[in-house]
Amino acid sequence: MEKYLIKMPIKSKANAVPEEKAVVKKGTPKMTGKVTKKDTPKELKDKENAGEDNTPKQTKGRPGRPAVKRKNLDNPDAKAEKKATEEENPPKRRSSRLTRSTRSMAEDGSPSPEKEKPEKLPFIKYKGAIKYYTENQDIAASADDVLQWVEKQKDEVVPMAFDMEWPFSFQTGPGKSAVIQICVDEKCCYIYQLTNLKKLPAVLVALINHPKVRLHGVNIKNDFRKLARDFPEVSAEPLIEKCVDLGLWCNEVCETGGRWSLERLTNFIAKKAMDKSKKVRMSKWHVIPLDENQLMYAAIDVYIGQVIYRELERREKAKIKNEAEFKENNGEAAFKAMKTLGETFLTKINEVTL
């Protein structure tokens, strides 16, 4: 026996302890604790079926908030509570009353005057001559012809429609004044393209500053300021002092208010529509030559300006005459009382008897 005991290798206790520690390291107490605390999938399923799982479930919305169960409306108590709440605070219901628009659509007959659709106005058709010049000497010769025509007129005041065009870019802003258009007679419009001009011809400057010439347009003062910035030989102040803004004049004669555009003024006074195409309005006015659409656009602007001036002039004369007759028949006090009504004088002047 001793023989066999001597030959067989026997492990010492010192060697056995590290092996036990190594086994313990493979399964640490933390790992074993987690495993023991976790429930198996089968146990979790059993708890869920038994109603023991109180862990809040994640829902869409704010994380970590438990889902709120809706009230069971089949319950008689819940129905009674809902009915009592509605009686105390009745829900807002859409009114069955017809609105102005639906009522006017439902009723037979014409709509109310304030809701009537605006009348479709016919577009302006200009059939007169268009004289278009691009070179300095041609512009000077044309301006001289117009100047001589003005001096031959017997009237003390010669109205002249005036307008300007220039290119515009959203990146660089407005360009230099490129076109001047004028009209002294509804049968002919003059268009002067300034692209090749470093300086305006002296005769053109003399024409627009002539004492008999009354320049007119819509927002015309800003045109003169721009022209003076682009061409220093033009002084803006004398032109501004003697010009006529058609929008302001319309407010005085027709007793209207607000600011006017040429398009709206054309609708109101001339009962015509303008084709204010953005493609033409924002086109390259400095490029020579202008095409037919540009020429017609520029000519119509001053042509209709001359038409509006003549119509406002006629209305002003009629208004002055009617006011004088009213004062003569009813007295100054009645005239002042009439003016305080705030209505358009010409439409009410014959309806009041004092």
From Swiss-Prot:
InterPro entries from the UniProt entry: 3'-5'_exonuclease_dom (IPR002562), 3-5_Exonuclease_domain (IPR051132), RNaseH-like_sf (IPR012337), RNaseH_sf (IPR036397)
A Pfam family hit: DNA_pol_A_exo1
Comp. bias (Basic and acidic residues): 36-50, 71-91
Function in brief: Has exonuclease activity on both single-stranded and duplex templates bearing overhangs, but not blunt ended duplex DNA, and cleaves in a 3'-5' direction. Essential for the formation of DNA replication focal centers. Has an important role in maintaining genome stability.
Subcellular location: Nucleus
Ranges of Basic residues composition bias in the record: 59-70
GO CC term, one of those recorded: nucleus
Region (Disordered), start-end ranges: 1-120
Enzyme class: hydrolase
Chain sites annotated for binding Mg(2+) 2: 163
Residues covered by the 3'-5' exonuclease domain: 146-314
Organism: Drosophila yakuba
Stated family: Belongs to the WRNexo family.
EC number: 3.1.11.-
Tagged with keyword Oxidoreductase: no
Keyword Nucleotide-binding: no
Modified residues (Phosphoserine): 104, 110, 112
Coiled-coil region: none
Keywords on record: Exonuclease, Hydrolase, Magnesium, Metal-binding, Nuclease, Nucleus, Phosphoprotein
Gene3D superfamilies: Ribonuclease H-like superfamily/Ribonuclease H
This protein's name: 3'-5' exonuclease
Binding site for Mg(2+) 1: 163, 165, 301
Gene Ontology BP term (one): nucleobase-containing compound metabolic process
SMART domains associated with the record: 35EXOc
